[in-house]
Amino acid sequence: TYRWFPPNSPLELSNSEDITKLSTDEWSDYLGKHEFDDSKVWTKPFHKLLDSSRDVLLKELSYIADASSDEIGYLSICDPNYPYLLRQIKDPPLGLFYRGNIQRLDSPAIAIVGSRKASSDALLEAQNLANILVHEGGVVVSGGAIGCDTSAHFGAFDDFERSLTIAVMAGGVDRLLPRCNDALFRKVITQGGLVISERLRGTDPRPRDFPIRNRIISGLSSRTIIMQAAQRSGAIATANLALAQGRDVMVYLPRLGDIRFLGNESLRDAGAPSFSSAEAYFQMKWE
């Protein structure tokens, strides 16, 4: 990744693409260190950019205004119901599109994530752990992917078949992927669970959207549990985000020396508590 900063003179901006890549923090940092003697120097090209983007902006605003018209809601960061923990992270989403039961955001949440090509024991324990968590009064957060995410979502149904899970999407909430999980997503939405995304409806996920999305998974949760991860993986990235956000991280580690759990071992070696089964996790909780 890289961070692009404007040059010393705004007249050197080569194109509108550079401006649109800047985050709010980057603009704040830059403007805090530079003062322009003549504001017209930079306001003119900035307004030109806004004019050129008018149609896109109006379309996006209409999506937000009409969000509730087709069972898609929108929750602004200014809304008092916006999740408290998510609001505390460095770069919270300015708003969340959602489908399903928005009250799931009110419950204590724990994230369960892991490999898409997980071992059978990691899949089983992800489901067992999620099931015990929801019976303890919690909500399970994950990313809707195949593998550990799917097992966690499936495990987060209570005895009354209510879905107590939050699936955080990398694309719009009407572009739910992977397609093989369509039945799961429908069940989550119609049986009390929640699907959310910061992306506009009608937006397909791009590869870069998944790691950006992961900050929401960890940001919603007081703890992130890694079920199985390679040294370099989305699950490890989510764990690092959780640590940067000041949240707890724990790892499932049934045995040492299994190359499929090298990421888990690295986190354990760095100080993350580990457990060997869902039952062992809850024994640790009460010790």
Language-model-detected regions and their locations in the chain:
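Short, small/acidic-rich helices and loops at N termini and domain boundaries
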Residues: 1-80
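Glycine-biased, small-residue-rich flexible motifs in mid-sequence functional cores and linkers
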Residues: 3-4, 72, 76-287
